[in-house]
């Protein structure tokens, strides 16, 4: 008799995705972050659901309702900080996941990669709207500044901004719709994740060597389920330590002041995970140019499969491109630091140089390095 997990219509899908899935035998711990992102998403939906039970999306009561959650709801403080810091964990895993894809050439599975870019945009949109909900100073001014960027769009910009605001400024209508979108988007993300996995399982997973691994596959369970559980335990250890010992470490003190449209904070900045893009936005003096650079900073990832010049997929055997890759990582860390600094000398020029370097490495230096390496290895 066939095992039920192989014959039942529903269990069969789970079996082919997480149990009997043929997986390359040599994938390293860098491949753990896909499952960690799944755990983060489940955690965010669960904690978010409980927060939504007590939160009110009204400008007069939003800030008080968050305070009420922290003070009066049983373990409300824990749920709130798990949700806030869970977002940080989500982005750490996301950046590593994308970075691993870039390093090992996983972007050559174009459908999976493009789906991942759509997911990245969706998660960033969700996180931005979530940051607005507590209705602190940084929530209000962050929402005002970022939504205002759309006014740079020629002809329809101003109308578009007022349409998104639901009025002539960020107000009750804006907060209500942001809450509605923040609630629905994670469920859309779950659907997108399923499509992402569908595309992934069409071609199978890549591996560190970048070579075809059809001849050397092992079942996902028990080998990689155990490996993933270890990753999950380490992630939870890190998250719980952060929540219990330094819950406000990654937050902004300004967000503990209720939103006041008449008082602008000295430094308006987003959460740490958006600082690199914010630095690129600020480094261009022109408003429309800045907005385009901001969008392109993520969208440039979609060009990677078309900019791949080497005959080798992975960077494992490509020292020149490896060096460029780590310079790019250092450059992104520099941009993250600059995004949190005031707009003054020397931060302006550092931000501009780091922004130029970011695009130059991806669009010019990496493709050139690929060709040089092929030449040196006599692979052309």
From Swiss-Prot:
InterPro entries: Cyt_b/b6_C (IPR005798), Cyt_b/b6_C_sf (IPR036150), Cyt_b/b6_N (IPR005797), Cytb/b6-like_sf (IPR027387), Cytochrome_b (IPR030689), Cytochrome_b_C_euk/bac (IPR048260), Cytochrome_b_N_euk/bac (IPR048259), Di-haem_cyt_TM (IPR016174). Binds 2 heme b groups non-covalently. Heme b b562 binds at residues 83, 182. Pfam families: Cytochrom_B_C, Cytochrome_B. Its main location: mitochondrion. It comes from the Eukaryota. GO terms for cellular component: mitochondrial inner membrane; respiratory chain complex III. A ubiquinone binds at residue 201. Gene3D superfamilies: Cytochrome Bc1 Complex, Chain C. It is a multi-pass membrane protein. Keywords: Electron transport, Heme, Iron, Membrane, Metal-binding, Mitochondrion, Mitochondrion inner membrane, Respiratory chain, Transmembrane, Transmembrane helix, Transport, Ubiquinone. Changing residue 203 to T: In strain: Isolate Eweb652. PROSITE patterns: CYTB_CTER, CYTB_NTER. It is found in: Mitochondrion inner membrane. The chain crosses the membrane at residues 33-53, 77-98, 113-133, 178-198, 226-246, 288-308, 320-340, 347-367. One of its GO terms (biological process) is mitochondrial electron transport, ubiquinol to cytochrome c. GO terms for molecular function: metal ion binding; ubiquinol-cytochrome-c reductase activity. Component of the ubiquinol-cytochrome c reductase complex (complex III or cytochrome b-c1 complex) that is part of the mitochondrial respiratory chain. The b-c1 complex mediates electron transfer from ubiquinol to cytochrome c. Contributes to the generation of a proton gradient across the mitochondrial membrane that is then used for ATP synthesis. The cytochrome bc1 complex contains 11 subunits: 3 respiratory subunits (MT-CYB, CYC1 and UQCRFS1), 2 core proteins (UQCRC1 and UQCRC2) and 6 low-molecular weight proteins (UQCRH/QCR6, UQCRB/QCR7, UQCRQ/QCR8, UQCR10/QCR9, UQCR11/QCR10 and a cleavage product of UQCRFS1). This cytochrome bc1 complex then forms a dimer. Belongs to the cytochrome b family. Heme 1 (or BL or b562) is low-potential and absorbs at about 562 nm, and heme 2 (or BH or b566) is high-potential and absorbs at about 566 nm. This is Cytochrome b. It comes from Eliurus webbi (Webb's tufted-tailed rat). The lineage of its organism: Eukaryota, Metazoa, Chordata, Craniata, Vertebrata.
């Amino acid at each position: 008799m066939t095992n039920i997990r192989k014959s039942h219509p529903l269990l069969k899908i789970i079996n082919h995705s997480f149990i009997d899935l043929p997986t390359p035998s040599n994938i390293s711990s860098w491949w753990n972050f896909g499952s960690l992102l799944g755990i983060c998403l489940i955690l965010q939906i669960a904690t978010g659901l409980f927060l939504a039970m007590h939160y009110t999306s009204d400008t007069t009561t939003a800030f008080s309702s968050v305070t009420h959650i922290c003070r009066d709801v049983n373990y409300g403080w824990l749920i709130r900080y798990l949700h806030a810091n869970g977002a940080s964990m989500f982005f750490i895993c996301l950046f590593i996941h994308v970075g691993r894809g870039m390093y090992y050439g996983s972007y050559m599975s174009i459908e999976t990669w493009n789906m991942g870019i759509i997911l990245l945009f969706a998660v960033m949109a969700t996180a931005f709207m979530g940051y607005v909900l507590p209705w602190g100073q940084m929530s209000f001014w962050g929402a005002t500044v970022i939504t205002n960027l759309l006014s740079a769009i020629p002809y329809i910009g101003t109308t578009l901004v007022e349409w998104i605001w639901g009025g002539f400024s960020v107000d009750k209508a804006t907060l209500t719709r942001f809450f509605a979108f923040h609630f629905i988007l994670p469920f859309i993300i779950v659907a997108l994740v399923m499509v992402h996995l569908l595309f992934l399982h069409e071609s199978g997973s890549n591996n560190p060597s970048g070579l075809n691994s059809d001849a050397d596959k092992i079942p996902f369970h028990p080998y990689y389920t155990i490996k993933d559980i270890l990753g999950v335990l380490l992630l939870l250890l890190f998250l719980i330590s952060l929540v219990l010992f330094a819950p406000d470490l990654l937050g902004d003190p300004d967000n503990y002041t209720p939103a006041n449209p008449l008082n602008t904070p000295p430094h308006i900045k987003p959460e740490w995970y958006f600082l690199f893009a914010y630095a690129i936005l600020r480094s261009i003096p022109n408003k429309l140019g800045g907005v385009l650079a901001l969008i392109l900073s993520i969208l440039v990832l979609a060009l990677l499969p078309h900019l791949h010049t080497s005959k080798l997929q992975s960077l494992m055997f490509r020292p020149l491109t490896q060096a460029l890759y780590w310079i790019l990582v250092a450059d992104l860390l520099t941009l993250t630091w600059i995004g949190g600094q005031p707009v003054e000398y020397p931060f302006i020029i550092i931000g501009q140089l780091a922004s130029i370097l970011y695009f130059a490495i991806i669009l010019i230096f990496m493709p050139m390095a690929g060709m040089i390496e092929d030449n040196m290895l006599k692979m052309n």
